[in-house]
Structure formats: C-alpha cells, structure tokens
Amino acid sequence: MYTHYLKNLVSFKSVTPNSAGAIEYIDDLLKQHSFKTEIKIFGDSKKEQVTNLYAIFGGNEPNICFVGHVDVVPAGNYEFWHNSNPFKFHEQDGKIYGRGTVDMKGAIACFLAASLNFIKNNTDFKGSISFLITSDEEGKSKHGTKEMLQYIYDQRYKIDFAVVGEPTCEKEIGDTIKIGRRGSVNFKLNIVGLAGHVAYPHKANNPLPCLIKILNELINIKLDEGTEFFQNSNLEVTNIDVDNDTSNTIPASAAAHFNIRFNSLHNVETLRQLIEQIIKQYCKEYKVDYKLEYSSSAESFIQNPNDNDKIKKFANVIERTLKIKSKFSTSGGTSDARFVKDYCSLVEFGLLSDMAHKINEYTKISDLQKLYNVYYNFLIEIL
C-alpha cells in the first residue's frame, strides 16, 4: 500500500516550490476516504505561489496531525541516476529510487497507509487524524506550513500533537527522534576604512587588520558548553570579501559573512548584542566604521520528553515495535517543526537521513515497512 502511494508521489516532478500535482493527488486520495480537505494557495506573486493542503478525519480530540512536504530539491544531472529519470519509480535490490523517496515522500506514503488502514480497522476510534502538507519546505518556507498553520487555526482547527516526517534516523529506523532544533542566524559585517596606495599607508586606513582581529576572536569564542539535549553553539565564517583585485591598493572596505547555529541558551537578540560588542571594541581601536546586518530563519526550540506524555508514548511505541531505544536529538538544520512548535507539541520522525538530497536517493522497502509499523502502532496507542 505504501509502495503504491510512494510510486505515485515520486512521479510528480515537484521541485520546490511546485506541487506539480502531488498535493492534488493526496487531496483526491483522502477525499475518497471521507477526509474533509481544503487546498490553499499562498504567495506574493505567480512565481512564489505555494500549494498547501489540510485534511482531517473525525472531529474530536486529540487531533493527531502529520506535517510534511511534497516539494523536493532539484535532481541534478539525470544521467547520473540509475534509470536516468529521478521522477520515475525504480525498484532494485529491495530499494526504491527516486527524488524525494527519503525527503520526504516515503514518510508521507507511510503515514497515508497507516492512517487509512487504522481508520478501516478501528471504526469507532475517538479523536481525529489530519494531514498538513505543503510544497514549500525546501525553499523559502514563507508561504507553506507557517501560513497554513495560521489559516487552519483561524478556521478554529486545533492540533493536539504533530508528527513531522523529516528523515531523522541515522543508522537504522527508530534510532533517532528529533525533539527540537538549533536556531540559525546569519551575519554580514562590513568594515569601512579609507582606500589608498600601499606605499602611503599613513594616508589610508586599511579595514582588513580590524576585520581579521574581529574574526579571530569570533571563531575562538566559546559560546557555551551545550545542554542535555543540545550540542554547543557554533559560529562558522562563510565568506570574506574585499572586492580588490589589485595588489598595490589598500581597500576601502572589507566584508565577512558568518553563521551561528545556537542552542536554547541563546536567542538571536542576545547573540547580536554579543557580536556587536566585540565589533565595536575593535572598530574603536582601529578607528574604522562598520555596518552589521543580520537575519534569522529560526530560533532554537526544545520540548523536554520528560515533561511530555505524547513524546514518551511515541518513543515507547518505537521501542515495542522495533526493539530499539531511540535517542532524543536536536541535531541538523532547520525544518518546518520550527513553525509547528508554536501550535502544539511534536516529534520529528522519518526515514534514514543519509541519502536525502543525493543523486540516486533511495530508501529500503524494509525501512518503509518499519516506519509504517511505527506510525500505525502510534495511532493505535494514542487514539
């Protein structure tokens, strides 16, 4: 059942932010099984239009919602794929190949199968099952899950617990549950000096010594020691640019870009204050000006499993189903869980992450079966 759904989902060339028919396929499938569905298209322009779906079966609490995305990253050169078509279902040696099989059409297929079988086998269950699916997670994530959550809550829908189907597992299905994510903030620093000839440095003010001093301190700063569920926060310099191709000219300015992935001990504003304090110190010493810009796609968040019965139940289901004790993790990049956490508690749990976004992306059929079993048994446990 899940392989059938995955075969159909892979066939849609849903490169972000395009649904390419994938969400419409899910909508039609769920309608056939008596789900109440609504598709909403959000976006500032035609190029940015994003397709979103909310579908629900039942009207009672708790409402267990699967949150996912059909959009995928570009497939690259088709010639490097086994069957020269990453959007055609290809099964070989117990594996299913195709763009999005891991991230995250495989998880969508498994939760679809688990939900429909659960409803078929448990006609008198109490509660609701819902799906929130977008075509804008791999891109800007501006008009997808974030806007759709606000819309459905304006319509008075309430989600009690969400399963986000990101590929979280590392070596085997069940070994990792994501219960939070690090925050991310990007900085762009521009040091403004005074251009001049290298033979007359006293008539110029080179911005580079100041920038070098600042970056040296930033890369050596110890932001924290980490927490029970988070690794230590980390700063990485990603670009240095002086826009100067001549060797006899002192540049007028020098710029650097850097990113901080941070845990729950910080937020964007406290980090900005710390960074700016260091910058001001050196700019004063070197008598240069500066401009600091920053942007953040996510604050950090954490849900302590010790304080959340539904997260505990999810972990217990994995242990009973797969005979493996899951590790609670906050590693990796950002995901749509950063939007969901403002509305309800959640876990992120899906397939193995190793092949996500890679040429010849694949998942094992046996892993799909394991994921299906976990999803199905969790619905039994919670509803």
UniProtKB/Swiss-Prot annotation:
SUPFAM superfamilies in the record: Bacterial exopeptidase dimerisation domain, Zn-dependent exopeptidases
Enzyme class: hydrolase
Domain of life: Bacteria
Organism (species): Rickettsia prowazekii (strain Madrid E)
Keyword flag Amino-acid biosynthesis: yes
Biological processes annotated in GO: diaminopimelate biosynthetic process; L-arginine biosynthetic process; lysine biosynthetic process via diaminopimelate
Protein name: Succinyl-diaminopimelate desuccinylase
Annotated Zn(2+) 1 binding sites: H69, D103, E166
GO MF term set: acetylornithine deacetylase activity; cobalt ion binding; succinyl-diaminopimelate desuccinylase activity; zinc ion binding
EC assignment: 3.5.1.18
Cystine connections: none
